[in-house]
């Protein structure tokens, strides 16, 4: 190839690169301009205004202080001209109809389905996040579907599901959207389920609890250092959340993903079980699940199934009645046993209930098992 042709091809290549860059920059600027138009978004609840158009979000314990143009840690709330806006209201990142057992809820409507939705964002950053593709991104970083609360409830009813589940990412940070959907869902006769990390301030928690039937907490580990190192959050606010949920009468289940060498020590498991029994009672279901390498924690091997089984045994030794296992092949860990007779009350295989021997929440011997059964 002659030098002249080489120069022509080099010039064309440079023009292509520059043109692509200009296009990407213009698209980014278009997004930014749209975001500066408050009419496009829903004003947030739970925030304070300060001098200089600074705001402080009071939805979760991060208590982000934001100058105009700044997003919160959650990537879902933004200060626009001195007001805080939800940037994810009405923007669904994913939606599915799932077995309720998948959440997992084991004491809620066995064998029924939940219309499950999520927006983008999360207010903590777990190194082992299972849904990081939507939880650790901004709303403009992925495709979303616009849907009003009325449309969401309509789709849930049309799907034949008996519940709406706010799940996959962190529903707390789409608080206004969840609240509006939950109100309509309750009025339409649907159950409402939160699958959350529990990182929320008390005032908004107490408001949302008025419209929620079941709350599942993804409890990261009974250790403050683990919370700080692995999630950027803190332990105490989550403990307070669980106490408030229990005191409200809303159904509560707890799940802990066990990670080798991080949150799987016997004393951590025993401490958690004792705390649950002392503060929440012996009938709150506790699930232990097996970790598989994901997101930024790829250098830790999958948790041995024996670790999950041992955690269940320890929690039961401490007096908890309903302790389950997940992500392992261990049938006893998927069965609800009648606490009086020891007989099988509900048998599950993976995400599905294959036998339900309860009658209005009671075993064959008449012993009541707590939960939401109809």
Segments the model singles out, each with a brief description of its role:
Residues 2-65, 262-374:
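Auxiliary Fe-S-binding modules of radical SAM enzymes
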Residues 58, 75, 120-123, 127-130, ...:
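Cys/His/Pro-rich metal-binding microdomains
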Residues 68-71, 85, 128, 137-140, ...:
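Generic domain-boundary/flexible-linker signal
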Residues 73-83, 87-95, 140-150, 352-365:
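Short cysteine/histidine-rich metal-coordination sites, predominantly Zn2+-binding motifs
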Residues 146-306, 311:
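Conserved AdoMet/S-adenosylmethionine-binding subsite of the radical SAM
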């Amino acid at each position: 190839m002659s030098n002249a042709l080489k120069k022509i091809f080099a010039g064309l290549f440079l023009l292509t690169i520059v043109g692509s860059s200009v296009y990407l920059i213009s698209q980014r600027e278009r997004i930014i301009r749209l975001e500066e138009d408050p009419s496009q978004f829903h004003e947030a609840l739970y925030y304070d205004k300060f001098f200089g158009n600074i705001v402080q979000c009071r939805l979760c314990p991060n208590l982000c202080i934001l100058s105009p143009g700044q997003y919160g840690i959650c990537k879902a709330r933004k200060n626009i001209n001195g007001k805080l806006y939800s940037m994810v209201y009405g923007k669904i990142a994913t939606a599915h109809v799932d077995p309720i057992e998948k959440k997992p809820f084991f004491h809620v409507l066995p064998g029924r389905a939940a219309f499950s939705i999520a927006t983008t964002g999360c207010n903590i950053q777990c190194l082992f996040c299972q849904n990081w593709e939507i939880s650790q991104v901004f709303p403009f970083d992925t495709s979303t579907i616009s849907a009003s609360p009325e449309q969401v409830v309509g789709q849930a009813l049309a799907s034949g599901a008996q519940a709406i589940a706010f799940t996959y990412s962190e529903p707390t940070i789409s608080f206004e959207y969840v609240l509006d959907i939950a109100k309509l869902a309750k009025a339409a006769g649907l159950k409402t389920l939160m699958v959350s990390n529990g990182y929320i301030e008390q005032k908004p928690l107490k408001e949302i609890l008025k419209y929620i039937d079941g709350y599942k907490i993804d409890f990261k580990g009974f250790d403050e250092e683990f919370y700080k190192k692995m999630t950027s959050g803190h332990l105490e606010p989550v403990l307070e959340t669980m106490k408030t949920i229990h005191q409200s009468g809303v159904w509560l289940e707890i799940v802990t993903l066990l990670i080798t060498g991080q949150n799987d020590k016997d004393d951590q498991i025993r401490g958690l079980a004792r705390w649950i029994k002392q503060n929440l009672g012996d009938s709150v279901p506790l699930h232990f699940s097996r970790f598989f390498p994901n997101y930024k924690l790829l250098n830790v091997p999958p948790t041995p199934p024996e670790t999950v089984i041992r955690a269940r045994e320890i929690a039961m030794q401490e007096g908890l009645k309903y302790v389950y296992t997940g992500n392992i092949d261990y049938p006893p860990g998927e069965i609800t046993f009648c606490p009086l007779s020891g007989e099988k009350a509900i048998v599950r295989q993976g995400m599905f209930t294959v036998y339900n021997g309860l009658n209005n929440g009671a075993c064959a011997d008449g012993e009541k098992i707590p939960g939401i059964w109809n």
